C-alpha cells in the first residue's frame, strides 16, 4: 500500500491464521457441507474426489484441494503446491506470514507500467445474461475493454497472449449503492490444463471513517519508485483486521470446466457473525447480492497457477457519490533535488607490457534538476612498489584545499588533494537540459593529456589503453562533479604483476607531517645507557630475583608458625542481630591450652560436648 503525511500502514497481501468453521461449497452440485476444526468427513463428500489439505510455501496460504482423478497418483511430491499429509500439522504455524506491505516489488521491479485507478460502477457490469463484461485495461488510462464471456474462458483476455508471465497489480475502485448488488471481476488470465488457486481476503472499512477511511493515493517509496495504491490509516488498522474470505481451487479445462467443478472453502466467520450472507465466489468473480455498509472495504484477489504464474488485484469498494474517496488528495511528496550517481568498477587491473585494454566506470544516474553542469574527471598518481598499500583519502576530494590534504606524510603512497595529482582526461557538459540522456542530447567537450596517450570513450567514463607501457602503472581516480560539487568517486589500480600494489579507501583526513598515521601504532623504545655493561645488568637482575624469593620464604614461615598456635576452631563472635553462628571443623588434638574456655562455651551452647569427630555446626539464635 502506501504512505501519507501521518503514519499509515498498508493493506497486507497475505493471510492470517485460519480459524473458525469451514464451509465447503460446490457451486455446480449446489451442496453445502460443514466441518469443524479442519476435520473432513470424507464419507460425506463425493466418492470420486479426494480433499486434501495443502500449503503454499511461497505465500503461506492454506486450503483444501479437490484432487479428483489425480488422487490415484497418491501425493505429488514434485509439486510446489501439494505437501505430504505429515506436513499438514505444520502449515498453521506459518500461516501468519504475509506477502509484504505496500505491494512493494509487484509490477515495479519487473518493469511493467502500473495501472492507474479506474472508476467502475457496479452498473457498468452488463450482467451474465448479455455475455458481455467490463475489464479494466492495463495501458495506464481510464478506458475499459469489453470482451465476450467465451473469450474470457480461453487464455489471456489481453490480445490472447498465452505465455505465462507475472502480472502487475490491478488497482480498481468500485462505487456501489446501498441495497444494490455488485460484482468484482478480476482481470483473469488462464491457460488450458493448469491448476489454479484463487484466494480472496477482505479488510472492512466500517470502523474507518473520515480521514482514516481507505483511499487511493499516489505513493513514492523512492524518487524513482512511485505508483498508485490503497492507503489505510494506522488508526483504522488498529481497529480492524484482514479476513481471508475464501479460497477456490480448480483445473482450467476451457469449455469443459463445468464437468470438473471447483471447490470453495469459506474460512471466515465475519459475515456469519454479522448475520449477513457471505459473498458468492466463482473463478475470478466475487458477488454480493445486497450491499450494506459492512461490505465496504478493500478486497484482495490473488491467483497462482501450477505453472508458476501469479497475479493479483486490489479492489476498493466505496459508496457511490463519495467525493472524498472518488477524488482523493494525493500524498504530499517532497520534490527530489540534485542528482543520484552510482558506479560499478574493478579496484584493480593487471596488464602485461604492450597490452591493449579499456578501463571502464559503469555509471548509473538519476538527475532531478535541469539545466545542470556535469564534469567527469580522471586523475592519476604513480604507484610505488614499496607501498603496501596505497591509500586514497576520499575526504580530500571534497575538501581539496584543506591543509591536511596539501601537506601530509608519505606522499608517495597516498592520494589526497586533486591539486597534487595529474589530470589524465576530463569531459564537461555545460547547461544541459536533458536529464534522462545527457550523453546523447548534450554537447560534451573532452580534453586528453597527450603525454598519457590514452583514448576517451563512452562519454568520458572509459579510458582505452593501447600498447600500454609499464610507465602508465598507477592509481586512476574517477570523480563526478554535479553543478560544481563532488557526487561520486571511484578508483582502480593499473599495474603489472611484478609491481602490483593494493589500494584502500580511507575515511577522514590523512596524517600531517608531525602526526603519525592513525592506523599505525608507534613502537615504544626504551633507551639503554651505552656505559652499562651486560654483566652488570645480569648481576642486577639475579640479585633482585633472589631477594624476592627470600622475602616470600620468610613470609611463608611466619604464617605457618602462627597457624600452628591458633585454636583448633573458634565460634564466630558475630553480633546478636545476626541469625546464625558458624563453627569450624574440630580436630582430635588441641594443642592450645588457652582454647578450653572457648571450647566449653561452644559445647554448652550447642547442648553437648564437641568430641573429636569432624563436623560443621550452624547455630540459629532464634530458637
From Swiss-Prot:
Domain of life: Viruses
Modified residues (Phosphoserine): 593, 595
Entry keywords, A to Z: Disulfide bond, Glycoprotein, Host cell junction, Host cell membrane, Host endosome, Host Golgi apparatus, Host membrane, Host-virus interaction, Membrane, Phosphoprotein, Signal, Sulfation, Transmembrane, Transmembrane helix, Viral attachment to host cell, Viral attachment to host entry receptor, Viral envelope protein, Viral immunoevasion, Virion, Virus entry into host cell
UniProt modified residues of type Sulfotyrosine: 438, 441
Predominant cellular place of this UniProt entry's protein: virion
GO biological process: entry receptor-mediated virion attachment to host cell; symbiont entry into host cell
Residues spanning the signal sequence: 1-30
Mod. after translation: Phosphorylated on serines within the acidic cluster. Phosphorylation determines whether endocytosed viral gE traffics to the trans-Golgi network or recycles to the cell membrane.
InterPro entries associated with the record: Herpes_gE_N (IPR046463), Herpes_glycopE_Fc (IPR003404), Ig-like_dom_sf (IPR036179), Ig-like_fold (IPR013783)
Transmembrane segments: 539-559
Region entry Fc-binding, spans: 352-499
Subcellular location: Virion membrane; Host cell membrane; Host cell junction; Host Golgi apparatus membrane
Region (Interaction with gI): 208-236
Spans within the Virion surface topological domain: 31-538
Glycosylation sites (chain numbering): 266, 437
Modified residues (Phosphothreonine): 596, 598
Membrane topology designation: Single-pass type I membrane protein; Single-pass membrane protein
Motif Internalization motif, chain ranges: 582-585
A cellular component annotation (GO) from this entry: host cell junction
Family: Belongs to the alphaherpesvirinae glycoprotein E family.
Subunit comment: Interacts (via N-terminus) with host receptor IDE (via N-terminus). Interacts with gI; this interaction enhances the Fc receptor function of gE. The heterodimer gE/gI interacts with the Fc part of host IgG.
Physiological role: Envelope glycoprotein that binds to the potential host cell entry receptor IDE. In epithelial cells, the heterodimer gE/gI is required for the cell-to-cell spread of the virus, by sorting nascent virions to cell junctions. Once the virus reaches the cell junctions, virus particles can spread to adjacent cells extremely rapidly through interactions with cellular receptors that accumulate at these junctions. Implicated in basolateral spread in polarized cells. In neuronal cells, gE/gI is essential for the anterograde spread of the infection throughout the host nervous system.
Protein name: Envelope glycoprotein E
Organism: Varicella-zoster virus (strain Oka vaccine)
Amino acid at each position: 500500500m502506501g504512505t501519507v503525511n501521518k503514519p499509515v500502514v498498508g493493506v497486507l497481501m497475505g493471510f492470517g491464521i485460519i480459524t473458525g468453521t469451514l464451509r465447503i461449497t460446490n457451486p455446480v452440485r449446489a451442496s453445502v457441507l460443514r466441518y469443524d476444526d479442519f476435520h473432513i468427513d470424507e464419507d460425506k463428500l463425493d466418492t470420486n474426489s479426494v480433499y486434501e489439505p495443502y500449503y503454499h510455501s511461497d505465500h503461506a496460504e492454506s486450503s483444501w484441494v479437490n484432487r479428483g482423478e489425480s488422487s490415484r497418483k497418491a501425493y505429488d511430491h514434485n509439486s510446489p503446491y501439494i505437501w505430504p499429509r505429515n506436513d499438514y500439522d505444520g502449515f498453521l504455524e506459518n500461516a501468519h506470514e504475509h506477502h509484504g506491505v505496500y505491494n512493494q516489488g509487484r509490477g515495479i521491479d519487473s518493469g511493467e507500467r502500473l495501472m492507474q485507478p479506474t472508476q467502475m460502477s457496479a452498473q457498468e457490469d452488463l450482467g451474465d445474461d448479455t455475455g458481455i463484461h467490463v475489464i479494466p485495461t492495463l495501458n495506464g488510462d481510464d478506458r475499459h475493454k469489453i470482451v465476450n464471456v467465451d473469450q474470457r474462458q480461453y487464455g489471456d483476455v489481453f490480445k490472447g497472449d498465452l505465455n505465462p508471465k507475472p502480472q502487475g497489480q490491478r488497482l480498481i475502485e468500485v462505487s456501489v449503492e446501498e441495497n444494490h448488488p455488485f460484482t468484482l471481476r478480476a482481470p483473469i488470465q488462464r491457460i488450458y490444463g493448469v491448476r489454479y488457486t484463487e484466494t480472496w481476503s477482505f479488510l472492512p472499512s466500517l470502523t474507518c471513517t473520515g480521514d482514516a477511511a481507505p483511499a487511493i493515493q499516489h505513493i513514492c517509496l523512492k524518487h524513482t519508485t512511485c505508483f498508485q495504491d490503497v492507503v489505510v490509516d494506522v488508526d483504522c488498522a488498529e481497529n480492524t483486521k484482514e479476513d481471508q474470505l475464501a479460497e477456490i481451487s480448480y483445473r482450467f479445462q476451457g469449455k469443459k470446466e463445468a464437468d470438473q467443478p471447483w471447490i470453495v472453502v469459506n474460512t471466515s466467520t465475519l459475515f456469519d457473525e454479522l448475520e449477513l450472507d457471505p459473498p458468492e465466489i466463482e473463478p475470478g468473480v466475487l458477488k454480493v447480492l445486497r450491499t450494506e455498509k459492512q461490505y465496504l472495504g478493500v478486497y484482495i484477489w490473488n491467483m497462482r497457477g501450477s505453472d508458476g504464474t501469479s497475479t493479483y488485484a486490489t479492489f476498493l469498494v466505496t459508496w457511490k457519490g463519495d467525493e472524498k474517496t472518488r477524488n482523493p488528495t494525493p500524498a504530499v511528496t517532497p520534490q527530489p533535488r540534485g542528482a543520484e550517481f552510482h558506479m560499478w568498477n574493478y579496484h584493480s587491473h593487471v596488464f602485461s607490457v604492450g597490452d591493449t585494454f579499456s578501463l571502464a566506470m559503469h555509471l548509473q544516474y538519476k538527475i532531478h534538476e535541469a539545466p545542470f553542469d556535469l564534469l567527469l574527471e580522471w586523475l592519476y598518481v604513480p604507484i610505488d612498489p614499496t607501498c603496501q598499500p596505497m591509500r586514497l583519502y576520499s575526504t580530500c576530494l571534497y575538501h581539496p584545499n584543506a591543509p591536511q590534504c596539501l601537506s601530509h606524510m608519505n606522499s608517495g603512497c597516498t592520494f589526497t588533494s586533486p591539486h597534487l595529482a595529474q589530470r589524465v582526461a576530463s569531459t564537461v557538459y555545460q547547461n544541459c537540459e536533458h536529464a534522462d540522456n545527457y550523453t546523447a542530447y548534450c554537447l560534451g567537450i573532452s580534453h586528453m593529456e597527450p603525454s598519457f596517450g590514452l583514448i576517451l570513450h563512452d562519454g568520458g567514463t572509459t579510458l582505452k589503453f593501447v600498447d600500454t607501457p609499464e610507465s602508465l602503472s598507477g592509481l586512476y581516480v574517477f570523480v563526478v562533479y554535479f553543478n560544481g560539487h563532488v557526487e561520486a568517486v571511484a578508483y582502480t589500480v593499473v599495474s603489472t604483476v611484478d609491481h602490483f600494489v593494493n589500494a584502500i579507501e580511507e575515511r577522514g583526513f590523512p596524517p600531517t607531517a608531525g602526526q603519525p598515521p592513525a592506523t599505525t601504532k608507534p613502537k615504544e623504545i626504551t633507551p639503554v645507557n651505552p656505559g652499562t655493561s651486560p654483566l652488570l645488568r645480569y648481576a642486577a637482575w639475579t640479585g633482585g630475583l633472589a631477594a624476592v624469593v627470600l622475602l616470600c620464604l620468610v613470609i611463608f614461615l611466619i604464617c605457618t608458625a602462627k597457624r600452628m598456635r591458633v585454636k583448633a576452631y573458634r565460634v564466630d563472635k558475630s553480633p546478636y542481630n545476626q541469625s546464625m553462628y558458624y563453627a569450624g571443623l574440630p580436630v582430635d588434638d588441641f594443642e592450645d591450652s588457652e582454647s578450653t574456655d572457648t571450647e566449653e562455651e561452644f559445647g554448652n551452647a550447642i547442648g553437648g560436648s564437641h568430641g573429636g569427630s569432624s563436623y560443621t555446626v550452624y547455630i540459629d539464635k532464634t530458637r
